[in-house]
Amino acid sequence: MATLIFVDKDNEEPGRRLASKDGLKLGTGVKALDGKLQVSTPRVGKVFNAPAVPKASRKALGTVNRVAEKPMKTGKPLQPKQPTLTGKKITEKSTKTQSSVPAPDDAYPEIEKFFPFNPLDFESFDLPEEHQISLLPLNGVPLMTLNEERGLEKLLHLGPPSPLKTPFLSWESDPLYSPPSALSTLDVELPPVCYDADI
């Protein structure tokens, strides 16, 4: 079904008043009254003392539109009224603002007592000057900590690292290289396997 478009002068522009499909089915009529177009709908039920002149139709968001148009007409943004200040009040305010700012000499004295913390200081390891690690190609080598000094000497005299000759470094207790007494404690008697039981 086609919709009807009417011109409405209340909105200050060629607005659109759409007649709904239900209104067209009920037989709504359009009446001109004092240059304004009004839509009248049939009333259902009893009507007591019906007015002779129909009321103007209510516009949606009418007050919002009016408020938005007022600043546009003046062309200036609205500013709140500021009370006029005398010379004494201005000087009092300026002295208050100057006294609230601390002097630059005594600002933050606790910064001088601050000890800087650098986490890289805990990652550095000291080596004696006679050992030169700069000759070794150490790219890709993980950080290793050796408990014994002789392990460090072995590492420095190995030469360039190669995948074929890797020295054994005991990082943890390895059961293959542990003494036989430790292996004997690990042997436990297990019960005999029973194959006859149905599972």
UniProtKB/Swiss-Prot annotation:
Residue interval(s) of motif TEK-box 1: 68-70
InterPro entries: Securin_separation_inhibitor
Principal location: cytoplasm
Pfam families noted in UniProt: Securin
Span of the annotated motif SH3-binding: 179-192
Swiss-Prot/TrEMBL GO biological process terms: cell division; chromosome segregation; DNA repair; homologous chromosome segregation; mitotic sister chromatid cohesion; negative regulation of cell population proliferation; regulation of cell growth; smoothened signaling pathway
Region (Disordered): 1-20, 68-105
Listed GO MF terms: cysteine-type endopeptidase inhibitor activity; heat shock protein binding; ribosome binding; SH3 domain binding
Subcellular location: Cytoplasm; Nucleus
GO cellular component: axoneme; cilium; cytoplasm; nucleus
This protein's UniProt keywords: Acetylation, Cell cycle, Cell division, Chromosome partition, Cytoplasm, DNA damage, DNA repair, Mitosis, Nucleus, Phosphoprotein, Proto-oncogene, Repeat, SH3-binding, Ubl conjugation
Modified residues (N-acetylalanine): 2
PTM field: Phosphorylated at Ser-162 by CDC2 during mitosis. Phosphorylated in vitro by ds-DNA kinase.
Motif D-box, residue range(s) on this chain: 58-61
Highest taxon listed in the record's lineage: Eukaryota
Phosphoserine, modified sites: 162
Claim: Transit peptide is one of the keywords in the record: no
Compositional bias segments (type: Basic and acidic residues): 7-20
UniProt motif TEK-box 2: location: 91-93
Keyword Calcium: no
Impact when changing residue 142 to A/L: Strongly reduces transactivation and transforming capability
Its biological purpose: Regulatory protein, which plays a central role in chromosome stability, in the p53/TP53 pathway, and DNA repair. Probably acts by blocking the action of key proteins. During the mitosis, it blocks Separase/ESPL1 function, preventing the proteolysis of the cohesin complex and the subsequent segregation of the chromosomes. At the onset of anaphase, it is ubiquitinated, conducting to its destruction and to the liberation of ESPL1. Its function is however not limited to a blocking activity, since it is required to activate ESPL1.
UniProt subunit comment: Interacts with RPS10 and DNAJA1. Interacts with the caspase-like ESPL1, and prevents its protease activity probably by covering its active site. Interacts with p53/TP53 and blocks its activity probably by blocking its binding to DNA. Interacts with the Ku 70 kDa subunit of ds-DNA kinase. Interacts with PTTG1IP.
Domain-related comment: The N-terminal destruction box (D-box) acts as a recognition signal for degradation via the ubiquitin-proteasome pathway.
Family that this chain belongs to: Belongs to the securin family.
Protein's UniProt name: Securin
Organism, as annotated: Mus musculus
